[in-house]
Curated annotation (Swiss-Prot):
UniProt keyword terms in alphabetical order: Calcium, Cell membrane, Glycoprotein, Ion channel, Ion transport, Membrane, Transmembrane, Transmembrane helix, Transport
Cytoplasmic side of membrane: 29-100, 181-372, 451-461, 539-566, 607-624, 675-772
Location of the protein in the cell: Cell membrane
Region (Cytoplasmic region required for homodimerization): 339-344, 686-688
Region (Disordered): 743-772
Bias type Polar residues, positions: 748-763
Species this chain originates from: Arabidopsis thaliana
The protein, known as: Hyperosmolality-gated Ca2+ permeable channel 1.1
GO molecular function, one term: monoatomic cation channel activity
């Protein structure tokens, strides 16, 4: 169990580590050869060019201006200068609202921390319960635990202070959540009203198109929307299964990179000896061949395969999926279609807003809609087992990441680890580092599971993965660490007391686990966030590409991939800190300052990254905010329930029942916010759509909208390549055509002429009129 000294050692090491990271970053960002890495967003926007530094040849690589090194922390105030409105124009609403999550954490926990330290810390400190428990009940504790609720004796009237503070914390948190929800909802509506024209504003994704023996999918979609949306339908683009073609294109890109590498190597060496490669595993074994000739042949072979596969996709109706992107003449019409049921059979002609083209995850559009339910059921079961079986290794690793655990596994290290500094280092750092390393591959696993489920947009994939990551953190990182840690640390006490005393021991031990979370926050939230700004992985990849693949300035531009925020990993991390802060605020207030440092540091670091580095892959107009709000509410309810359970073990029978109202109030508040603000995030108001359409018609009366939308939702592998014969894949309707193409013999429900029959079938009214 970490002591105050251990916490101090851990804090010193993590602060020093963060400071070193900032110094290294300050040096690297000033060097001209790193400029594209640390200011990549400005290069992508065409607003920055390679810095011209004096000093001749050396000045191209090293910044020789010594005065610039004296302002190594100047980037911090610079990151805070850009106004929010300008930042939205620069980086998008998603990035700005993501930053507001950190700001929300500061607004919630700063007043809570001051109130908790002013009221609860004196109440907890001025007792001697833990001293008595240490002597008479053999319960392990340290001086730092005297600041927790565990130091208050059972049945004490002092628990009223914690109950009153729980109400105060809940009211303040709910108030800030409501204000923030209202602000973000207004920002979203204003952003949607002011943003420029985008293809997704006019387009819906139609899925589960029913099969028809007489018409192709394209003809059927065209006919259905000409009949049911005759005044508003504009064009459509059927979805095809181009996954194999995309794999071939990706393979060709990799082969071309190797060819560029060997050609560049041969040219730069000025040697008559041509580069050699081996055909075996990873080029380490097998027959030796001329590398340049080999990769030229492989690229040519793959190009032929791509051409053949492209023809198959274009001409084979089996590659056409029962889905289509349908575009309308107005945003109003698209909103009506996306938000209504199209037929009396609710399982067919399913419509939803189309994601913007860059947000589409194209491989999943080829998944049959009928298989999605089974896929999601399988992944839910897999996630259940992943979550709950992960508790065992996490508990085991954490049990070893202690002095007692190491001495048990490796007794020969006892002499070393019993030294004061080494002991403090282990107690203050090892458990947090072990947990962080244990979770390093989890985001990739969860993202793979989300992709298997078949979601069609990158934004929704990230939100789904973030949701699962949050649940995993809740069950394993929080509950698993608390329960397993308490059980291991109090094992001796568990074995030497009657069973009815065990809940009391757990109730006393849970607040003590705050010391572990303090060390974890410093490792993950202090040093980890500071390390984010270094961007070591993108930096290394850029320089490797620059050294071995870059031949032109365009190659140099493509060599840098700045990445994006990473909502699927960043948001669950933030939510873990919300959970820890709300749970431990009335129990162990000492944890709150560490959380405040995280929120403040992360806000500055990520604001800098959003301004200078990250290039967001999509823009969802803050559609993720209901998830953020819901998870903070979940954390608030968990904190209330745990406090009720904790007071129950403390025999605070007269005070504990007064907490029952808190979850009820919180759930009622959540339902109010859900009804009041959530519609702005799941539906597009028809009034807003009509206003935007009216303004656009007034400003651009001659806009060729069909030309703008015609190719917006073509699969990326058909754009910019050779032999792009995708004419059969694009709707060729003209605005004036009102004829409905069909191969059917009868069309009694079609109010427009058929190309086959030459005239429309008589309506029921006409038939009745003739009979009369």
């Amino acid at each position: 169990m970490a002591t105050l000294k251990d916490i101090g050692v851990s804090a010193g090491i993590n602060i020093l580590t963060a400071f070193i990271f900032f110094i290294i970053f300050a040096f690297l960002r000033l060097q001209p050869f790193n400029d594209r890495v640390y200011f990549s967003k400005w290069y992508l926007r065409g607003l920055r060019s390679s810095p011209a530094s004096g000093g001749g040849f050396a000045g191209r690589f090293v910044n020789l201006e010594l005065r610039s090194y004296l302002k190594f922390l100047h980037w911090m105030p610079e990151a805070l200068k850009m106004p929010e409105r300008e930042l939205i124009d620069h980086a998008g609403l998603d990035s700005v609202v993501y930053l507001r999550i950190y700001w929300l954490g500061l607004k919630i926990f700063a007043p809570i921390a001051m109130l908790a330290w002013a009221v609860l810390v004196p109440v907890n400190w001025t007792n001697n319960e833990l001293e008595l428990a240490k002597h008479f009940k053999n319960v392990t504790s340290s001086d730092i635990d005297k600041l927790t609720i565990s130091n208050i004796p059972e049945g004490s009237n002092r628990f009223w202070a914690h109950i009153i503070m729980a109400y105060a914390f809940t009211i303040w948190t709910c108030y800030m959540l409501m204000k923030e929800y209202e602000t973000v909802a207004n920002m979203r509506l204003q952003f949607l009203a002011s943003e420029g024209r985008r293809p997704d504003q006019f387009t819906v994704l139609v899925r589960n198109v029913p099969p028809d023996p007489d018409e192709t999918v394209s003809e059927l979609v065209e006919h259905f929307f000409l009949v049911n949306h005759p005044d508003n339908y504009l064009t459509h683009q059927v979805v095809c299964n181009a996954n194999k073609l995309a794999d071939l294109v990706s393979k060709k890109t990799k082969l071309q990179n190797w060819l560029d590498y060997y050609q560049l190597k041969y040219t730069r060496n000025n040697s008559q000896i041509r580069p050699i490669t081996k055909l075996g595993c990873l080029g380490l074994c097998g027959q030796k061949v001329d590398a340049i000739e080999h990769y030229i042949a492989e690229v040519d072979k793959t190009s032929k395969e791509i051409a053949e596969e492209r023809e198959n996709v274009v001409n084979d109706q089996k590659s056409v999926m029962p889905a289509s992107f349908v575009s309308f003449k107005t945003r109003w019409a698209a909103a009506v279609c996306a938000q209504t049921t199209q037929t009396r059979n609710p399982t067919e002609w399913l419509t939803e807003w189309a994601a913007e083209p860059r947000d589409i995850y194209w491989p999943n559009l080829a998944i049959p809609y009928v298989s999605l339910t089974v896929r999601r059921l399988v992944m839910n079961v897999a996630f259940f087992f992943l979550t709950f079986f992960f508790i065992i290794p996490i508990a085991f690793v954490q049990s070893l990441a202690t002095i007692e655990g190491i001495e048990k596994v490796a007794p020969f290290l006892k002499v070393i680890i019993e030294k004061d500094f080494i002991k403090s280092l282990i107690q203050g750092l090892l458990a947090g580092i072990a947990l962080k390393l244990f979770l390093i591959f989890l985001p990739a696993i969860l993202m793979t599971m989300s992709k298997f489920e078949g979601f069609t947009s990158v934004s929704f994939l990230e939100r789904r993965s973030a949701s699962r990551y949050y649940i995993f953190n809740l069950v394993n990182v929080f509950l698993g660490s608390v329960i397993a840690g308490a059980a291991f640390e109090q094992l001796n006490s568990f074995l030497n007391q009657s069973p009815n005393q065990i809940p009391k021991t757990i109730g006393m031990a849970i607040p003590m686990k705050a010391t572990f979370f303090i060390t974890y926050i410093m490792v993950d939230g202090w040093a980890g966030v500071a390390g984010e700004i270094l961007m070591l992985k993108p930096l290394i990849i850029y320089h490797l590409k620059n050294a071995f693949l870059v031949k032109t300035e365009k190659d140099r531009e493509e060599a840098m991939n700045p990445g994006s925020i990473g909502f699927n990993t960043g948001e669950p991390q933030i939510q873990l800190y919300f959970l820890l802060g709300l749970v431990y605020a009335p129990v162990t207030p000492m944890l709150l300052p560490f959380i405040l440092v995280f929120f403040a540091l992360a806000y500055v670091v990520y604001r800098h990254q959003i301004i200078n580095v990250y290039n967001q892959e999509y823009e969802s107009a803050a559609a993720f905010w209901p998830d953020v709000h819901g998870r903070v509410i979940t954390a608030l309810i968990i904190s209330q329930l745990l406090l009720m359970g904790l007071l129950g073990t403390k025999h605070a029978a007269s005070a504990a029942p007064f907490l029952i109202a808190l979850p009820v109030i919180t759930i009622g508040f959540h339902r109010f916010c859900k009804g009041r603000f959530e519609p702005a995030f799941v539906r597009y108001p028809l009034q807003e759509a009509m206003m935007k359409d009216t303004l656009e018609r007034a400003r651009e009366p001659n806009l060729n909208l069909k030309g703008y939308l015609q190719d917006a939702y073509i699969h990326p592998v058909f754009k910019g390549g050779d032999n792009d014969d995708d004419g059969d894949m694009i709707g060729k309707l003209e605005n004036e055509v009102i004829i409905v193409p069909t191969k059917r013999q009868s069309r009694r429900n079609t109010p427009a002429p058929s190309r086959i029959s030459g005239e429309s079938s008589p309506s029921l009214a006409v038939i009745n009129g003739k009979e009369v």
